[in-house]
Amino acid sequence: MGERLLVSHFYAHPVGHAVEALHYAHGHWGSDTSREVSVLLNARTPVELAGLCPWVTRAYAVDHPLLERCADSPARLAHVPREWDWVLDDGRRYQDWQLELFPGLREFSAASDEWFACRIGRSVSGQHRAGYAQAPWRFQIPRQAADAATDTLNGTGPRIALMPAGSSGPEHYPSTASWHLVLDGLLEAFGPDLQVVLIGKSSDEDGRTATAGAGRYMTLRDHPVTPMSAYDRPLVEQLALVEACDAFLSPHTGFGLAALACGTPWLTLSGGRWWEYFFNGVPFRSILPDGAHASGSFAALEPEPLAADGDAERSVSMTQARIRADVPRIVRAAQELVNGTLSYERAIAEYYAELRTRVEPAAIWSIDNVHVAYL
């Protein structure tokens, strides 16, 4: 039996952070496939995604607060085996500002330092000290779910999965009226055979993230495209539908990382706090905001400026004026991705050439530092 590694990624619970951990697990397994690689995740994140990754031996869910302090951190780790050859931490736990922002992360980290015993060593996930082979990977969607998705999307036209919002406040995402403009453009470009499926989750009562403003976005089903709704279906079923589509369309959201793990090209209405930083060897397009519409974007945790947008205030990069101006760019990008005319290398080179005009190059970061080769 080879070495036993634990990728310890206790962090915020949006789905994208689980995908990050599984990506690192794949890289550490890929450097020596005789290894047994397990992952530790926040219990509120979709831990079941590890079951779609045959290189993951086991996933450990840890029920521990992130935003608040915790009086019994050691007890919450007791079900995780203590002894490993390697424990590989999420690098965020070594960032002082993260520990200030998330007191629970500080206490989890201290408890894990006390609990884990490493035969060889401890490092940061993605670092080569413990062996790491960066390579694209894909979720292994169960055949039954994949076949059901194919049966559901049984038309002959282009297929686009649409997630209209992520899990932050509704002011960070386009309005229903803006999405109607996008669907108008897509319908004109692709014709009546276009199939659109709505992806999302309407409630966070189970402790997991939900799609902001989910109820309002259900009115998109009244658009002439007649999107079908996959809202609130089990996560694996929704991922199977995404995998069966030609493109995944959304604002910046961690679910986009899951789409890339399905091998589905991601078309992002970029803007807001974060740029796109994970790519997984899949063609993509990020429609970066231009000019005044970019005001306040990509400032991480700094407050975003809001602008009047109909009957609400919205991030400047997500207003109807911005979306209307960018519909032609969105449609062209959708055509590239649906038609398969865009290579990954061209996509990433053009993305970073444009991003560096919006963000100081020294401030840009990405998973596995893939940006370095393009700046």
What is the role of each PLM region?
Residues 1-55:
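N-terminal pre-catalytic "stem/leader" segment of glycosyltransferase-like enzymes
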Residues 6-9, 89-104, 148-214, 272-274, ...:
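Active-site donor-nucleotide binding/catalytic segment of nucleotide-sugar enzymes
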Residues 48-67, 214-228:
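Structural recognition of alpha->loop->beta junctions
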Residues 54-141, 147, 156-165, 169, ...:
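Conserved nucleotide-diphosphate donor binding/catalytic pocket of glycan-assembly enzymes
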Residues 114-152, 282-375:
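Leloir-type glycosyltransferase catalytic cores
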Residues 176-272:
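Donor-binding and catalytic core of enzymes assembling or modifying cell-surface/extracellular glycoconjugates
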Residues 260-292:
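Gly/Pro- and small hydrophobic-enriched strand-loop and loop-to-helix capping segments
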